From Swiss-Prot:
This is 3-isopropylmalate dehydrogenase. It comes from the Bacteria. NAD(+) binds at G279, S280, A281, P282, D283, I284, A285, G286, Q287, G288, K289, A290, D291. The keyword ATP-binding does not apply. Pathway: Amino-acid biosynthesis; L-leucine biosynthesis; L-leucine from 3-methyl-2-oxobutanoate: step 3/4. GO terms for biological process: L-leucine biosynthetic process. Homodimer. The keyword Manganese applies.
Length: 347
């Protein structure tokens, strides 16, 4: 394990500045005294776009590549046309750094309300393929603006891309107590891509005899996520289905305000990026109202990815305890929550 962490910090837009500041405080408190934390802040997002017209240049990628990991606050602002920052920054970074595993833990934490009846046991992880499917930009339009307009959006699925994300999901399932893995797709209709996913899922599964597996159509999965969320342990799925069901998973486990995520390059060839699922929330930016818990839980994912398991667990335990103690109490500011969690983590 490296005894230093060289971290790229991207506060981004809106509340990103506020929540990332709290995440860094907790990160510093969690690290052992002999681990040196070095950070470099990058000004990406709406402000830079308006000033320069740039989102993410090749020189930016070269600079980011020198770091061990990336912590992102939020990217997005209503002053920028829709899709400009998403494609020009987020997707460009994902493809450039081969972040082919999008990791989304979904756990109902103490003191957090779920819209589901009762208080079901919710503790699973979605492993979403991040660099293929219909998000590769493979498509086009003709006869645009006419009654005969045609648009195509091609879903790209390769055996190489599928196998590596499926293998990652099996390894994560193997490491969890329940050792269960579900493949979610729609292979009865999307027969070409669906059968490729299914065949590779079954073949890789032969190497993981301790992992119990099942296949589930995506429409059935959305039902079971609501009616039987406790049946899930690890889910692996493609880019599009993963984009949809991870938001449903966040909704049933307390909302995106406490949802963390990681965009992972498991090989370590490029730094992985960790971020809260919530957006930039420009309507409350600068008011101290943003809850930094999702960012702080993303810091825990970052530490676990870098090999600091005990420190990651300590952060998660601190957030759980803090959430449990909030019930029935007045809302606190962003700084107050961050300060309280920093004290808990520091011990």
């Amino acid at each position: 394990m490296a005894r230093s962490i060289n971290l790229a910090v991207i506060p981004g837009d809106g509340i990103g500045q506020e929540v990332v500041a709290q995440g860094l405080k907790v990160l510093s408190a969690a690290l052992p005294s002999d681990v040196k934390l070095e950070t470099k802040e990058f000004d990406f997002g709406a402000r830079r776009y308006h000033a320069t017209g740039e989102t993410l240049t090749d020189a930016d990628l070269d600079a980011l590549k020198q770091h061990d990991a990336i912590l992102l606050g939020a990217i997005g602002d209503p002053s920028v046309p829709s899709g400009v920052l998403e494609r020009g920054f987020l997707l460009k970074l994902r493809f450039a750094f081969d972040h082919h595993v999008n990791l989304r833990p979904s756990k109902l934490l103490p003191g957090v309300e779920t819209p589901l009846a009762g208080q079901p046991e919710i503790d699973f992880v979605v492993v979403r393929e991040g660099t293929e499917g219909p998000y590769t930009g493979n498509g086009g339009t003709i006869r645009t603006g006419t009654p005969h307009a045609v648009a195509t959006e091609v879903s790209l699925n390769t055996a190489f891309g599928i196998e590596r994300v499926v293998r990652d999901a099996y390894a994560r399932a193997q490491a969890r107590p329940r050792k269960k893995l579900a493949l979610v797709h729609k292979n009865n209709v999307l027969v070409h891509a669906g059968h490729l996913w299914t065949d590779i899922f079954n073949k890789v599964g032969e190497e993981f005899p301790d992992v119990t597996t099942e296949y589930m159509h995506v429409d059935a999965a959305t039902i079971y996520l609501v009616t039987q969320p406790e049946r899930f342990d690890v889910i692996v799925t493609d880019n599009l289905f993963g984009d949809i069901i991870t938001d449903l998973a966040a909704a049933i486990s307390g909302g995106i305000g406490v949802a963390a995520s990681g965009n992972i390059n498991p090989s370590g060839a490029y730094p992985s990026m960790f971020e809260p699922v919530h957006g930039s929330a420009p309507d409350i930016a600068g008011q101290g109202k943003a809850d930094p818990s999702a960012t702080i839980l993303s810091v825990a994912l970052l530490l676990r990815h870098l090999g600091y398991e005990a420190e990651a667990a300590r952060i998660e335990e601190a957030v759980s305890a803090d959430l449990a103690e909030r019930v029935g109490k007045p809302a606190r500011s962003t700084d107050e929550i961050g300060d309280a969690l920093t004290v808990r983590v520091a011990g």
